[in-house]
Regions:
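Intrinsically disordered, low-complexity, charged/polar segments
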Residues: 55-77
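Residue-level "contact hotspot" at macromolecular interaction interfaces
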Residues: 16, 22-23, 37
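Generic preference for hydrophobic/aromatic residues in regular secondary structure cores
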Residues: 9, 18, 41, 63-70
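Basic/aromatic-rich interaction segments and small domains that mediate binding to polyanionic partners
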Residues: 29-60
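Generic cytosolic/nucleocytoplasmic N-terminal low-complexity/intrinsically disordered segments
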Residues: 1-2, 23, 49
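Mixed-charge, Lys/Arg-rich low-complexity intrinsically disordered regions
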Residues: 1-18
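Residue-level marker for the onset of beta-strands and adjacent loop->beta junctions
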Residues: 18-19, 56
Length: 77
């Protein structure tokens, strides 16, 4: 049987994020729903959904680093 483990994969700037990415915000792992930037591209609004389905928006500067998480499969012996 295979187990899925959530692991830290990388730190990304807001412009590297994609919808569906799993990121860490305030000790919670959330899913990116939408990403928008201001006219200058210096401030990004990242709309995200938590495990309870609640949607919130977090703002980041263009050079902030955001922890990206991914699921990996582990074979159980």
């Amino acid at each position: 049987m295979n187990n899925m483990e959530l692991v830290h994969a990388d730190n990304l700037t807001p412009d590297q994020l994609m919808e569906g990415d799993l990121i860490k915000i305030n000790d919670d792992i959330v899913e990116v729903v939408n990403i928008d930037s201001d006219a200058t591209g210096s401030i990004y609004a990242v709309e995200h959904q938590n495990e309870f389905g609640e949607i919130e928006i977090a703002e980041y500067n263009f050079d902030d680093l955001i922890p990206l998480y991914v699921f990996i499969e582990e074979d159980e012996e």
